[in-house]
């Protein structure tokens, strides 16, 4: 379903879990499931989401149906083309699967939290087919540093 819009601030709990906002959970097609035993493997199981480290210092969350579309393009990349092989390696190195429990929480690994600079507070930005997770101070800096660029880009595309 998707259509994630807006932003909310939440906190990572002591076990490294993040509560997905209720308004985003209502738009998801993923069904939370506490019975999943592992956070590794395929997120297409009930309750699974894909989480990806992004070069800008954020994390992105995708539902399996959305990630499947992206993966279609990735699998078409050639292992015999060095640039395409590198892209596949970098993408998959930056990717993990996480389960969502019945309370709507996901457990994020220390590696992923460190990548995003998230220690406790996190801003969850709804970006239509994905959710973007930011450390609040990083997001504030990106928005502040790119205010004039936003005007130019918005003028170009809207």
Curated annotation (Swiss-Prot):
InterPro entries: MraZ, MraZ_C, MraZ_dom, MraZ_N, MraZ_sf, SpoVT-AbrB_dom, SpoVT-AbrB_sf. PROSITE patterns: SPOVT_ABRB. GO terms for molecular function: DNA-binding transcription factor activity; transcription cis-regulatory region binding. Its main location: cytoplasm. Gene3D superfamilies: Transcriptional regulator MraZ domain (3.40.1550.20). Keywords: Cytoplasm, DNA-binding, Repeat, Transcription, Transcription regulation. GO terms for cellular component: cytoplasm; nucleoid. Coiled coil: none annotated. It is found in: Cytoplasm, Nucleoid. Residues 7-66, 95-138 form the SpoVT-AbrB domain. It comes from the Bacteria. The keyword Transcription applies. PANTHER family: TRANSCRIPTIONAL REGULATOR MRAZ. Belongs to the MraZ family. Forms oligomers. This is Transcriptional regulator MraZ. It comes from Prosthecochloris aestuarii (strain DSM 271 / SK 413). The gene is mraZ.
